[in-house]
Amino acid sequence: MKKYNKDNIPNELLEAAKFISEDKLKKAEPILRDYLKSDPLDVNAMKLLADIGIKFRAYKDAGYLLIRALDLSPDYDPARLSYANLLYKRQLPFEALEQISILLEKDPTNIQYLTLKAVNLALANQHDNALEIFEIIIKEKNVVNNQLHLSYGHTLRAVGRLDEAIESYKNAISTKVGYGEAYWSLANLKTFDFTNEDINEIKSLLSNKDCKIDDYYHLLFALGKAEEDSNNFESSMAAYVKGNSIRSKQVPWDSREFSLECDEIIDFFDEDLIKKFKDVGDKNTDPIFVVGLPRSGSTLIEQILSSHSLIEGTTELQNIIALSRKIANKKNSSSKSEYPSALIAMDKSQFKEMGAAYIKNTLDQRVTDKPYF
């Protein structure tokens, strides 16, 4: 691994780092790509480019870069930390925990490593272990950080300690003025009531021209809930509409394109296709899962089914989504998806491999008191 000091850092890396610090990622990306063409073994450049990829949700490319960097330089801890963060964002907590364990062996009291371990334990439904770490960081090490208090609040909420969750969200707000996500987390508890003073405070924060966009739309959603609870329905709807309008500019969404994709999937998976693929795939009968759409009632169905003594409920899993993305084989956001058409060209062995991989990758989620699988 190349070691740089202030006198020998390549100009390209300095320029890219400057753009990254200014959040001008689209300017930094081509600089790093061009630099890596001339020096393909520079793990520092790989890590910087991977971090940009993570922010753009180009997880496949970012993962390749970080794995390559760690192959070349296993002791490059910043790259390993980025890789652990990537795995967390991909909702692969057990894989992330493996990377974090390597980091903690070297630096067992590192707050950043411990925090990342805690949030991954929470993601893996190991809430008690996560809370233990959060409480060491917050109560024993006296670390003050808005994101830390927010994550701690989420974990407290998951185990039903709602009063403590509220306190933690309020601590997050006191740590960072105008922290929109914490206000929205309070609103999303459904049991928390904003006071008139709270509502006026949110309105004041929204009028601040320095309010960042992420805070802004979260504050609008919180205001919408607060006004709704106060029966000010017109003001509530106005806040929700404005918040969603702002949020929609950050999330790539084309309703017409989505409708066409749904129509294509419905037409593709017809009776003839199902008959053709009847005997392919992994023969294991382990998983019981409900496939549905957000806001369609599938969560309620899952809750009803999982109350049965022989059915095991997990959490919302990303494995099917990840599998469909793998089949889609999109190189970037503008390239055409190969899903579902690519299924036609697959042979029986590929279906069996995908089924077996699904079983394997969901085993870690089976941590309830009904281990029938």
Regions inferred by a protein language model and the residue ranges of each:
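Alpha-helical solenoid repeat scaffolds of the TPR/TPR-like class and their adjacent stem/linker regions
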Residues: M1-Q365
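Conserved two-lobed SF2 helicase motor
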Residues: P371-F373
